[in-house]
Amino acid sequence: MKEKLTIIKVGGKIVEEESTLNQLLADFSAIEGYKLLVHGGGRSATRLAAQLGIESKMVNGRRITDAETLKVVTMVYGGLVNKNIVAGLQAKGVNAIGLTGADMNVIRSVKRPVKDVDYGFVGDVEKVNAGFLAALIRQGIVPVMAPLTHDGKGSMLNTNADTIAGETAKALASLFDVTLVYCFEKKGVLRDENDDDSVIPVITPEEFKEFVAQGIIQGGMIPKLENSFSAIDAGVSQVVITLASAINEGSGTVIKK
């Protein structure tokens, strides 16, 4: 029987505010068994870029990562945000280690090819070093992963944190009984976006298609759910979309086959 592993993905909005970060770290610390945290950090990067006189360019909500911006996100994601989380977890007795994809070749990516938009130094994940992560986890060490990967040729790459969480979950699914939790600003996937209590408790692939056709699920939630079903297909036991403050409550939307 596989040992349980919980992978939590949190956005920058949560980890950049002291009050919400402290609550998250307390809730994360209370998770029993093996665990791993993946974080974002976009607003901090935007702020530092502005202070340095570097313009932040976004297309469809995605950051364009030119050479100067890459320096900023590497400093912020791999440094400031990541180490604040690690220090906070250590203070709560959690033996955490901060990682980017370059550390021990944890995640190697390929630079995204230019199609309609040139996103610059943005990585699409090629390989996750599951063996190394599993070795850390089984020693009781908790990986805290920044949204940065590398190309194996000496360059860092800015990489979507949702993608890192999903690909890491898939890679570890053969070794652990993995639950992947995407922390969201809502209580889960909503039947009515104007009613915060209209949470859909369970979504199957068939229901997902119906909800999209009916316009109940739309926009950025569609790729999030597509990634969730991809993780399930790759052997992840369960994917949950819920509030960051509810990761120990068993609430939210569960994605199932």
UniProtKB/Swiss-Prot annotation:
Similarity annotation: Belongs to the acetylglutamate kinase family. ArgB subfamily.
Residues the record marks as site: Transition state stabilizer: K9, K224
Lineage: Bacteria, Pseudomonadati, Bacteroidota, Bacteroidia, Bacteroidales
UniProt protein name: Acetylglutamate kinase
Disulphide bonds in the chain: none
Gene Ontology annotations of biological process type: arginine biosynthetic process via ornithine; L-arginine biosynthetic process
Species whose genome carries this gene: Phocaeicola vulgatus (strain ATCC 8482 / DSM 1447 / JCM 5826 / CCUG 4940 / NBRC 14291 / NCTC 11154) (Bacteroides vulgatus)
Location within or outside the cell: Cytoplasm
Annotated function: Catalyzes the ATP-dependent phosphorylation of N-acetyl-L-glutamate.
Predominant localisation class: cytoplasm
Gene3D superfamilies, per database record: Acetylglutamate kinase-like
GO CC terms: cytoplasm
EC number(s) given by UniProt: 2.7.2.8
Top-level EC class as recorded in UniProt: transferase
Catalytic activity line of the entry: N-acetyl-L-glutamate + ATP = N-acetyl-L-glutamyl 5-phosphate + ADP
GO molecular function, one term: acetylglutamate kinase activity
UniProt KW Disulfide bond keyword: no
A UniProt-annotated Pfam family: AA_kinase
Alphabetized UniProt keyword annotations: Amino-acid biosynthesis, Arginine biosynthesis, ATP-binding, Cytoplasm, Kinase, Nucleotide-binding, Transferase
Residues binding substrate: G41, G42, R63, N158
Annotated pathway: Amino-acid biosynthesis; L-arginine biosynthesis; N(2)-acetyl-L-ornithine from L-glutamate: step 2/4
